[in-house]
Structure formats: structure tokens, C-alpha cells
Amino acid sequence: MLSHIKYIDLFAGIGGFHQAMDSFNAECVFASEWDKDCQYTYEENYGIKPYGDITQIHEKDIPEHDVICAGFPCQAFSISGKQQGFEDSRGTLFFEIARIAKYHQPKILLLENVRNFEKHDNGNTLHIVKTTLEETGYNFFYKVLNASNFGVPQKRERIFMVAFRKDLNVTSFIFPSGINSPITLQDFLEKKGIDEKLIIKRDDITLKENIKIKPDMFGHYPQKPIRIGTVNKGGQGERIYSPLGHAITLSAYGGGVGAKTGLYKIGDTIRRLSPEECRRITGFSKKFKLHPKPTVSYRQFGNSVVVPVLKSILEQILQNNILKTDSLKAAS
């Protein structure tokens, strides 16, 4: 396990990185998150109240650590945003990570951002990150991974970046490809106690006729969202999907009656997903305590990293014996 490893959790959100690192028994020695609601959820679950604005924290005041975890703010690079990148103050927060890494020289940086980060500004944004970390003393690797391939029924494509301190002599790193798991959204749904507010009752619901969703020869359904209808004009947040496929990407923002979770035909009803179902398809543990306000929970999971993807990356790092541990498996 990673019981001898100390890490810091920057732009911590509700602790997706914490969930993954904790499953290997690593020790969180510092967390930072400016959002008050996320601070509340983080402290409720991990007993640590994150510090606020990282730009106001001197690197000397941060404890020594082996790993930096950071899902740095993505709105500046998101397809759904204005894509201003480093021109947006949120985009420049990457350099806070570099500042801390330069001072502390941890062994590994584990970073995450939206898929569009790879292509933003014709690849220049990613190039700046790569060059900055290389100049800080690291070998840099990245890959876009889809959560659908890692045991959760949510299409969520994100770029994952791993940087190894150069003296570790990691000259190549192969990211995990995922697992072949025949799961569907239906497997992750709550069976009872669904809030009536989640159900959509409207006259402008249109379902495609004679749709037959069949498994393949191995009994597996398509590992992607399957659209089967619309509400209103079928714009973003107005599309209906089958639970026999995967969920669309959870979103912190967006409009439409199905905003943030999408709409699904479950039995005879059309409804949004519950906060508990969002927890499940993001891979957070059963013990995780949701924020008491559903609207806040939706936003938090819409911004979160998917935990099983991080676990797989960590296992890949361990298989390379980079952190010299005695176990390759995360706790369940």
C-alpha cells in the first residue's frame, strides 16, 4: 500500500483524488479548496478543512509531500465555457502547482483537466504545461481517458497528466487502457425512494418508436449513452437516454430540464438522476456523505474526477515500482 506516502490535494473539490489515494492508505497532509460548499463536504468526509485561496498560501507553509494531486480549474479550457485558457485567471492557477512543485520537488504530480485541454489553443496550452514541468525537473506524460472504460457507466472524457521527478528515471509511462466491464446505468440506479421532483411530466416528450436495444453476442449492451427521445426541441439538457447504456457526462452547469445529469426513461417515467446515483457513477465510496442540498451535490459531482480512473493510474504507477510499495491493489 501507500501508507508511507504523503500527498497534498490542490483544488480539492469534494475529494476525488482523496478517495483514490485513501484507498491505497496514503496520507493527506494538506488540502486547498476555495469553494465553501466543497470545503464543507470535504471536511464532513475526511475530517480535514481545506485551506482557501492557494494563491495566498506560501509554499514554505505547505508540509513536505511525495505527491501533488490537482484537478485544477477547468472552466477556462472547457468546451462549454469560453475557452480563454491562460487568459482567464482560473487558467493561470496551473502555475500555482508549478510554484509548489519547484519548491518541494515531490516525486510525482498527478493532474486532471477537461478533454479540451489537449487541443486548446492548437495544443499550445498543453505545451506550456509540459514545458513548465520539464523545466521544473519532471518528465511529463498525458492521455485522454474515458470513465466508461473503468467500471462506471458515465461517459466522461478527461485528460490525465502524470509528471515524474527526473531522478526517478521514468522515461516512459503507459496509461491504463481500462477494463472490459458489461455494466449499464441500470445497474447503478436506486431501486426505491426516488424523489418525485426528479420525474419529468410534460406534454412535449417525444420517444423514438420501435427502438430495440439488444446486447451483443456476449450479453453486453453498448458502453455509451443511447439516445431514445427528446423533450421540447431536443437541445442540450433536453435529450432522453436509455438506462441500458451509459450516462452522459455529469455537468456542473448548463440549462434544460435535464441539465447536469441528463434524462433517462426508467420504467414508465422520464427522470433526472438523483445525487446518490451521481455518487455511484462517479465512483465515490458508499460511505461518502452527500452535501445536504441536492443542487450543490449536482454541481460538485459535475466538477469531480471519476475515482476508478485515478485508482487505475495509481496501480499502473505502482506496477512500475516507482513508489516502491508492497501491494498493487487498492482497498475496496
Question: For the regions a protein language model found, what residue spans apply to each?
Answer:
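Glycine-rich SAM-binding Motif I of class I
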Residues: 15, 19
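Class I S-adenosyl-L-methionine
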Residues: 2, 57-67, 77-249, 255
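Conserved SAM-binding strand-loop segment of SAM-dependent methyltransferases
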Residues: 47-54
